[in-house]
Amino acid sequence: NRLLCEINKFFEDFEQSEFYGKKAYDMNSNDPRVVCAYGELLVLTNRAEEGTDLLIKAYELDPVGMGASNADKRLGDVMFGSYVKGDYQQCLVYDKKIGRKQPIAWAAKIASLESLNQSQEKESELKKFAGTYPDLVLGEEIDKLHFQDTTVKQTMKDLVS
């Protein structure tokens, strides 16, 4: 069920993704992989408050996650959820705990800084991102996200540019 949630989320069939995600969560609400998958779906479908709570729960259940060598992925997920729900300070708090940020975690941090009118810090982070990922364009990374409401994606892209 968790995998069907992920697959349907990728193809933007949010109704089916939620069906399988909720089913998986109801069957095993303490499996961090299930909690994370369902939490990500909720963040992408305009229920960021609940989704971020689940992402934090997944981090607390298993900070490192199966196959990972550190907690950076889970922390990045929480940063992203915090940004989407509008808790920019929480995003920055979790940023202090992360080691190497993935592009979406960078986008969440940079968009949060812009939302908090911290332009100098935003510019500094944009330069750090470009140095860390010289071949990536942040807007293109945001385009890879599967938001149900595309205005959320566009707002994020506008804030990081």
Name the predicted role of every residue range.
Residues 5-8, 13-161:
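Alpha-helical protein-protein interaction modules
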